[in-house]
Amino acid sequence: MARTFFVGGNFKLNGTKSSIKEIVERLNNAKLDPKVEVVLCPPAPYLDYTVSLVKKSQVSVGAQNAYLKASGAFTGENSVDQIKDVGAKWVILGHSERRQYFREDDQLIAEKTAFALSQGVGVILCIGETLDQKKAGTTLQVVERQLQAVIDKVKDWSNVVIAYEPVWAIGTGLAATPEDAQEIHHSIREFLAKKLGEKTAQETRILYGGSANGKNAVTFKDKPDVDGFLVGGASLKPEFVDIINSRS
């Protein structure tokens, strides 16, 4: 089946009003492949502003994180309702930087994912292995463990997009080869089929998220299980348009 190509831009802790305006206006004015779904994830203070700038229907806005409660005494957190209230439709959960720096474990990420989905936003669920885990040959065990935690809490995956991000490739300039990525994406899809059924496995989009850029994105073009990219640093640059158009 044909899965809609998906490109997410994770701005991380980068951006100002002026730089975000420049990024969005570049997309507004560019000729984008109309068959691609694009999601921009700026820092939380700029969600509202980014939503106000977007002019293309294929481009929507997502948050980089959300808490697992609707409201309350949780200083510094943002709720899913607040994210939705300003017009965002997606949230990134499970990113390796959240796992590493903020000690978010598989269980917490699963709970946050289930809650976000129940509140009506789409989830970009990040999974991936560290360099040590890759060297130890445990990549599949790691990503299957991360997925299983979410599978235990989420039965409807229609609003989940998986982003496989080899942690050793993030921000390092290193990237998995397209062949490596295809092999792991295929294994992830087989795991989903085993746990959730063939239909869910075939419908769930699996993105590659390790140092994708304007030059290497096109090399993934013929890989059937790579359904798009979660882009970090390159989403802040003009080459983001090239990544979006890498299938056309």
Curated annotation (Swiss-Prot):
Q: Kindly tell me the pathway this chain contributes to.
A: Carbohydrate biosynthesis; gluconeogenesis; Carbohydrate degradation; glycolysis; D-glyceraldehyde 3-phosphate from glycerone phosphate: step 1/1
Q: Does the keyword Isomerase apply?
A: yes
**Keyword set for this entry?**
Gluconeogenesis, Glycolysis, Isomerase
Q: What class of enzyme is it?
A: isomerase
Q: Name one GO molecular function term.
A: triose-phosphate isomerase activity
Any one GO cellular component localisation term in the record: cytosol
Report any one BP term from Gene Ontology. Answer: gluconeogenesis
Q: Which residues form the active site?
A: H95, E165
The text of the family note is: Belongs to the triosephosphate isomerase family.
* HAMAP family in UniProt: TIM_B
Subunit organization: Homodimer.
Question: What name does this protein carry?
Answer: Triosephosphate isomerase
Q: Which organism is it from?
A: Zygosaccharomyces bailii
- Write the lineage as a comma-separated list: Eukaryota, Fungi, Dikarya, Ascomycota, Saccharomycotina
Encoded by which gene? TPI1
